[in-house]
Structure formats: C-alpha cells, structure tokens
C-alpha cells in the first residue's frame, strides 16, 4: 500500500509541476524573435536589440485620420502590443468599430542600423484583403537620433500598398538610443595649452629642486632664474620700445640755443614810437 501511495503522490506532484511550467510559459511575455534559426541569429542584430532594451517597457501610440477613418497605431519595442494574444509588435485599431489589425509580429523581426538611425521591421502581420497580392502586412519603424529624449514622436509616415508585393507601413520615432557614441577629443588649442602648462610645471618644480638641493638657495632665491623674472617687465618694455619706435630716443635738436653773453644790449629807444603821444 505504501509504495502505491508514494507513487501516486509523486505522479501528482509531477502533474502539478507540469501545469505550473505550462502556465508560466503561456504567461511569459513574448519578445523579438530575429529572423534565422534559434542560436544562429546575427550578433549585430542581437546587439541592436539589447541596445533598445530601455524601451521594452514603453508603449507608443499615434492617432491619424478623422471621422470613421480614424485609426490608432500602438507600437512596442520587442514586446506585445494590442490584446497580448496575437504576438503583435505593432497594431492598427479602427476607432469607429474597435477592430484590431496586426501590422507586424514579433516572431519575424529584422533590425539594422546606420550612423544615427535604427530600422526595426516587424513582418508577419495580418493579410491584406485586396491589396498587395493579399500578402502579410509589414511594419517598418525608422528610429532617428535625438539626444534630448529617450523615445518620443512616434508617428505613421505612409502606407505603401500600391505594389503587387513588398508593401509596408512606414513609421518614424526619435530616440537617443539611435545616436552614435560621442567621441570626445581635445582641440589643437587645448592640446597646446595642456602642453604649455606641463612644461611650466616641470620648469618651476625642477628649477626649485635644483636651486634648493644643488645651489643651496633659500627663500625667494629658490625660484629658478629669479633675477630674469624680476627684470622681465623692463626687458619687455625695452623690447617694445625698440620694435615700436621709428626714431632713436635721443635725437639731437635741430636748433642751437643762444647764450646770454651772445645777446646784445637792446636799445631803449627801439619802442619809443609805440608810446602814446
């Protein structure tokens, strides 16, 4: 009796465990399934999906049209949009009747990028009724670089359905995640300034140590070439005077002075005619 009871308990536990695992698997949220066999996806695409991970928990909406032709587009990055049962990454909802159309699904995701943009494509949407050879819909989301926002400005751009095949819905969105990493580098002026400051520091410290340890100087005399720096102002003034002046400083006078001994006695009658009569 005991072996049978033990087997029955073990079987019940295994059954409950299987049900729990199944429920957990069903409730687990779907994510992007890149094109290609499992484990053989492009490493570049996997890196781009990881790069967009901060957007996984965000949902984006945009409303277009008017009246009975008003549609709401709901988009999520590598997460289910809409009713969470169709595996859709982007859906279209007719506002007048609430009909939901899957534009693209997560299980057919393709992603690539350029210098300042990322292109996310969801394929496998609901089939067209009369357009594009009744092929499945496809969503193309162009994520452009905008360093001032994590994600914003999700808007539909156009729907290309005038072709026999390869039709698509085009959307755009801004995100800082699409921007290339900023490469910080010093300008030429900064490099020269750093170099000059380094040379000055080496000169002052090295000269100070030399004056103190080798020469045995004390106080202000430890500063290297102290006499030169004290007289620098005069040297600069002399140099400016030499460069800027066009004539020598001591120019001989163009006239010669007359001494008192060379002056004759003036006649007192010279101005008599100016006196009033």
Swiss-Prot record:
Disulfide linkage: 32-78, 132-167, 145-179
Glycosylation: residue positions: 57, 83, 94, 107, 113
Residues in compartment: Cytoplasmic: 211-277
InterPro entries from the UniProt entry: Man-6-P_rcpt, Man-6-P_rcpt_cation_dep, Man6P_isomerase_rcpt-bd_dom_sf, MRH_dom
DNA repair among keywords: no
GO cellular component entries: clathrin-coated endocytic vesicle membrane; endosome; late endosome; lysosomal membrane; membrane; perinuclear region of cytoplasm; plasma membrane; trans-Golgi network
All residue ranges annotated as the MRH domain in the record: 30-181
Pfam families recorded: Man-6-P_recep
Record-linked PROSITE patterns: MRH (PS51914)
Record topological domains on the Lumenal side: 27-185
Topology within the bilayer: Single-pass type I membrane protein
Membrane-spanning segments: 186-210
Highest taxon, organism lineage: Eukaryota
SUPFAM superfamilies according to UniProt: Mannose 6-phosphate receptor domain
UniProt region (Disordered), positions on chain: 256-277
Annotated localization: Lysosome membrane
GO molecular function, one term: protein domain specific binding
Endpoints of the signal sequence: 1-26
Keywords: Disulfide bond, Glycoprotein, Lysosome, Membrane, Phosphoprotein, Receptor, Signal, Transmembrane, Transmembrane helix, Transport
Other facts noted in the record for this chain: This receptor has optimal binding in the presence of divalent cations.
Record remark: domains: The extracellular domain is homologous to the repeating units (of approximately 147 AA) of the cation-independent mannose 6-phosphate receptor.
Function (record text): Transport of phosphorylated lysosomal enzymes from the Golgi complex and the cell surface to lysosomes. Lysosomal enzymes bearing phosphomannosyl residues bind specifically to mannose-6-phosphate receptors in the Golgi apparatus and the resulting receptor-ligand complex is transported to an acidic prelyosomal compartment where the low pH mediates the dissociation of the complex.
Quaternary state and interactors: Homodimer. Binds GGA1, GGA2 and GGA3.
The protein's name in its UniProt record: Cation-dependent mannose-6-phosphate receptor
Recorded name of the encoding gene: M6PR
